[in-house]
């Protein structure tokens, strides 16, 4: 889907794995480097890996890009319409970033609890006991991790993908907010993609 975008001019895959690098190239992306191990640990941030990729490409080619779009491979349900709408919103609103989010339906923050001394208590937002999902307000959203469209300098200078007063949402429908973190997530995504 990403290759169909009317905005994206380069598709760079950042990986530390040679097999993934070859698959990326076979699928039409560029993978001109292997990411250094310092940016590939469990402690490394996505931002540091993105900054490395942008700096590497800009240094090699002597160019500076205006916008950077991160499309996470663990979120395979996004469409070219989602990608382009995020970029259009970034440009038209002059936002620092536009990130994909989806509405929390049955997992509203008011339903989050903590256990202290074997007793359940509200985590941060009080829940009215026996409240129905549709009664929980305000509507709550969570980052889907699917699309991060950013001004280049917001990433490279500020070191962020979101969080400024000028970060905006792109609301993904629930069915396109699949995030693969576990084997069960993978099975669900595979079923949906084969549907």
Please place each PLM-identified region on the residue numbering.
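N-terminal glycine-rich phosphate-binding loop and ensuing alpha1 helix
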Residues: 1-14
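Short, structured coil segments at secondary-structure junctions
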Residues: 7, 27-29, 116
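Short, high-confidence coil segments that cap the C-terminus of an alpha-helix
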Residues: 8, 63-65, 92-96
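A conserved hydrophobic position in a structured secondary element of the catalytic/binding core
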Residues: 15, 78, 149-151, 172, ...
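Short phosphate-binding loop-to-helix
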Residues: 18-69, 78-81, 85-88
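Conserved core of the sugar-phosphate nucleotidyltransferase
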Residues: 48, 76-166
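Active-site acidic Asp-centered loop
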Residues: 71-73
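Hydrophobic helical membrane-anchoring modules
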Residues: 169-195
């Amino acid at each position: 889907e990403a290759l169909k975008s009317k905005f994206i001019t380069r598709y760079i895959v950042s990986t530390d794995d040679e097999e993934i690098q070859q698959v990326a190239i076979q699928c039409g992306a560029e993978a001109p480097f292997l990411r250094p191990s310092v940016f590939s640990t469990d402690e490394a941030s996505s931002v540091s890996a993105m900054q490395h990729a942008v700096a590497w490409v800009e240094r090699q080619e002597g160019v500076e890009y205006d916008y950077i779009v991160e499309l996470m491979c663990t979120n395979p349900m996004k469409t070219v319409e989602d990608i382009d709408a995020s970029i259009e919103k970034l440009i038209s609103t002059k936002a620092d970033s536009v990130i994909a989010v989806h509405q929390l339906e049955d997992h509203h923050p008011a339903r989050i609890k903590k256990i202290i001394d074997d007793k359940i208590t509200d985590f941060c937002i009080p829940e009215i006991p026996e409240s129905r999902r549709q009664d929980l307000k305000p509507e709550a959203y969570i980052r889907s991790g699917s699309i991060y469209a950013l001004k280049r300098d917001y990433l490279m200078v500020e070191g962020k993908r979101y969080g400024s007063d000028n970060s905006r949402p792109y609301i993904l429908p629930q069915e396109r907010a699949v995030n693969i973190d576990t084997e069960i997530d993978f099975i669900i995504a595979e079923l949906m993609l084969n549907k």
